[in-house]
Amino acid sequence: MLNHLKQHFGSRRTGGHGGLDIARHIGPGLLVTVGFIDPGNWASNMAAGSQFGYALLWIVTLSTIMLIVLQHNAAHLGIATGACLAEATTRFLPRIVGRAVLGSAYLATIATAMAEVLGGAIALQMLFGLPVRAGCVIVATVSMAMLMTNSYKHAERWIIAFVGVVGLSFLAELALVKVDWPQAAASWITPSMPTGSAAIIVSVLGAVVMPHNLFLHSEVIQSMHFEGQGEQVIEERLRYELFDTLFSMGVGWAINSAMVILAATTFFAHGMVADDLAVAAATLSPILGPASSTIFAVALLFAGLSSSVTAGMAAGTITAGMFDEEYDIHDRHSSIGVAACFVGAVTACLVVPNPFEGLIWSQALLSLQLPITVFVLIRLTSSPRVMGKYANSRPLNALLVGIGAIVTILDVVLLTGM
């Protein structure tokens, strides 16, 4: 990764590539950030912090590093080939294998959307007293309407604004608590596995590194338009993309860390376990004051809405890719994929008995599909037939395989610990 940084930012400089020019290209990575500050993350992070204090902050750091490498690789695929991960899967894998991979990814995306919609519904219940099931229908309807009636650029602006609201909300919450920063700093870089933490560790991993984001990032990045064509444009896009990914994933790491720290300093410190987001918000009031629970609920609502939109977009990307097409909300394959995803998500929300447990287990299920998507991505980006001169180097390939192995091992730990 350091070599990538030197190559993209230190080895040469072309005119007009200043800070403002780079800032104009920040956006695709923030769409991915939305996916790992979603309600599923809230449930996993609250469980991690309330049950184990600061001890599991290291998995947030590890997951974010893994995410940076994987998302950069997915974006690399989109830039070098002009095809997203779903399209490349259809083009370069045997038909039956490609359909199986994309089918499992689509089911994982429905599980993702369920978590996002359910989280938004829980926020509506906190704020207005609405029943969770009614809230699920409202959140899904609003999210689908945003996708069906807005271009990508308009949706991107809304989503970036939502990320800002969530980030500022957690800054406000942290200002209300006393954080043991030396202990937090040590926990960010010191792995530990307290007794009973295996399922939470894997759910945090599944909440940060998510398969649908790999499909979404590769689609969004390859759909951006740059002037000119050829290798020079590809190199330029790779420079911008790496900065965008590093910046955006850093924002996500900070917000996820803030969730764990908030839970550790409030619930764990008082001997309470946050096994329900609504109860967690209500419990904040007597500890931190009445404004804290409202801030918590507003941030959760914006997180649920924005991540529901990106989950729906990823679903449309996958179904379009099955037919070797780019995502286009006005295209039949994309729009059907979006609509079916939200219908499936709402149906799941209506039958799940416990919303909080539904959020936790949706993240664990995502982590079980993740190795499939990761190894398909590695297979494609390491192939000169697919990537040409931009195929993965051996060191990068080794790193990616190592990440895939870690994901798989953690999945085995989850299954054997159930």
What residue ranges belong to the model's regions?
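Flexible loop linkers connecting adjacent transmembrane helices
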Residues: H4-G10, S44-G49, H72-V97, I122, ...
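Juxtamembrane transmembrane-helix boundary signature
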Residues: V32, I59-R91, V101-A108
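Extracellular/periplasmic helix-exit of transmembrane alpha-helices
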Residues: L67-A80, I221-Q222, G230, G250-V279
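Hydrophobic alpha-helical segments and their helix-loop junctions in multi-pass secondary transporters
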Residues: V163-T190, L205-I221, V376-R385, L410-M418
